[in-house]
Amino acid sequence: KIIVEKDPVRTSFEKWAQPGHFSKTLAKGPNTTTWIWNLHADAHDFDSHTNDLEDISRKIFSAHFGQLSIIFIWLSGMYFHGARFSNYEAWLSDPTHIKPSAQVVWPIVGQEILNGDVGGGFQGIQITSGFFQLWRASGITNELQLYCTAIGALIFAGLMLFAGWFHYHKAAPKLAWFQDVESMLNHHLAGLLGLGSLGWAGHQVHVSLPINQLLDSGVDPREIPLPHEFILNRDLLAQLYPSFSEGLTPFFNLEWSKYSDFLTFRGGLNPVTGGLWLTDTAHHHIAIAVLFLIAGHMYRTNWGIGHSIKEILEAHKGPFTGEGHRGLFEILTSSWHAQLAVNLAMLGSLTIIVAHHMYAMPPYPYLATDYGTQLSLFTHHMWIGGFLVVGAAAHAAIFMVRDYDPSTQYNNLLDRVIRHRDAIISHLNWVCIFLGFHSFGLYIHNDTMSALGRPQDMFSDTAIQLQPIFAQWIQNTHALAPSLTAPNATASTSLTWGGGDLVSVGGRVALLPIPLGTADFLVHHIHAFTIHVTVLILLKGVLFARSSRLIPDKANLGFRFPCDGPGRGGTCQVSAWDHVFLGLFWMYNSISVVIFHFSWKMQSDVWGSINEQGVISHITGGNFAQSATTINGWLRDFLWAQASQVIQSYGSSLSAYGLLFLGAHFVWAFSLMFLFSGRGYWQELIESILWAHNKLKVAPAIQPRALSIVQGRAVGVAH
């Protein structure tokens, strides 16, 4: 059955050229400056353009193609910079002494000071994106390949742009297609994840592995055969991996162990590059592909066999859960906000897990010894994960306000959660109070004892110990596990677990067992505190999005509103939007502590140089365990010790970071202006300025208005 509608919407440049064409009110044009804010707020709020779920679904689907085309353009730019402006080939020939750079600043008003010496006679800005390491792992050996990939990405960007137009204006899917979840699961699991992983595994085996094997052996990149030569000439591969000479025979004979020369199960890191064994990662991608190809055949479509999501959900009942998951299928196929909320929560958590794996199991060659890149990747993935998790709460709240129909959700799990929301929130609040007082209480105790000169009464590894015994037990079991579960593995999954192994590359520590002590125990409970407060704010926003004792008719006021009218004091900052706004601040809080912890811990206990005698000199000399047990220690030995280097960077090639540091604090202070000043103050000021303009007969046609309360908060939180 074909579920596509032909030519549903005319392509009209005249319509698109009119700002606000998606809304009757906005299309009339501006009366006041509020118009431009509403334009930004509603341009992508497809719910406000139409009530037709089919049209909304098509717009989202089309927008996804637009998003993909932007991603391809961005990627193309990265690869083009690598091809045109970088020292990639030099770095590839000597990655331990030459730093990655892909940007050379033009000599305008002395800015060329930013071009530091990155080694190999190249002057430029050191980059910390990890692209060089990724390219090496992919088997890219010269700049021509980067050019080709950049051009390929632009072609794909064009294709995506075309697809976005085509599937909205020429052949738009009907609503039934968007709601056919079993078919969608099969195709996404088997196609995207299954065949995607298999394709990547194929590239790794036929291109990446042989090229990296030769690079690791010290062969000049210019002498290594090109990718197509490995793909077309099996004998070339057989020289490196003998099992290639047997072709697919062992596969069909079930003698799979013959392939263990290029599909390994080693564990640990490659001592040459300090990255995971690429033969391990190729093996991993084949295993993942098999799993997802099977998963992509599990759901019932045309043949009457397999799982039905609706049946699974409706059968999901426990003795104390009433109607269980009945009604959730209808929610997830008719509310894209609900669907998005679940996906964002999952993807956000996964992104944070990725942040931790990037340093514990560094996947690319020479990544572990590039400390700036390690720090950047950790920070990047933590922030992205944080935004996605807050986004999950935002869309869950929008679902509650716009899409939730209480009459169809009686006594199922969602209804039951909403009915005992007071118990959930008050318990969560108690947990936050407990964690806050106890975690900070331990720090305050330590600061006081330190100030009174009583170090023997402090909580630290050298006085009253609070060892994280459960974390240490987990570390220990993981370090010992492979000897039982994977007897052929040479090391555990990550060197961080323990076991005494250390990998260093070019005299720099790649990774070693990370010791955990009292300082980690203390800061861990600060993490627990900040995360629980974030969850408290966000969950309260979702569970009270439709109604509360204070405002029983909140659902009628919408997702965002400043206050419940002038007649009711004390009802400001209660909208679901405001909870997202406040939750964002606590998310920022949480992530700051995490990044501080990671940054100092790694510099103190992991990163550093190692001499011929095997003596390690850590960057901050192992001061974390003693200093991180007091607030004063954090301020003096981490924040000031590190920030002062940035502040004193003027006049050196690092000065951009000093200026960014200054600028970031300026932006932060600027945000407070929007958060702490009332709307009326600005309106009064504007009217006074307007009076002067009128006096001189230069009054604007569009009447200036102060930002609304919600707009001011949006600007504040963004800055």
From Swiss-Prot:
Family designation: Belongs to the PsaA/PsaB family.
Residue positions binding chlorophyll a: M673, Y681
Assigned EC number: 1.97.1.12
Single GO cellular component term: chloroplast thylakoid membrane
GO biological process: photosynthesis
Xref: PROSITE patterns: PHOTOSYSTEM_I_PSAAB (PS00419)
Recorded GO MF terms: 4 iron, 4 sulfur cluster binding; chlorophyll binding; metal ion binding; oxidoreductase activity
Entry protein name: Photosystem I P700 chlorophyll a apoprotein A1
Gene: psaA
Sites where the protein binds phylloquinone: W682
Pfam families: PsaA_PsaB
Residues annotated as transmembrane: 60-83, 146-169, 185-209, 281-299, 336-359, 375-401, 423-445, 521-539, 579-600, 654-676, 714-719
Residues the record lists as binding chlorophyll a': H665
Assembly mode: The PsaA/B heterodimer binds the P700 chlorophyll special pair and subsequent electron acceptors. PSI consists of a core antenna complex that captures photons, and an electron transfer chain that converts photonic excitation into a charge separation. The eukaryotic PSI reaction center is composed of at least 11 subunits.
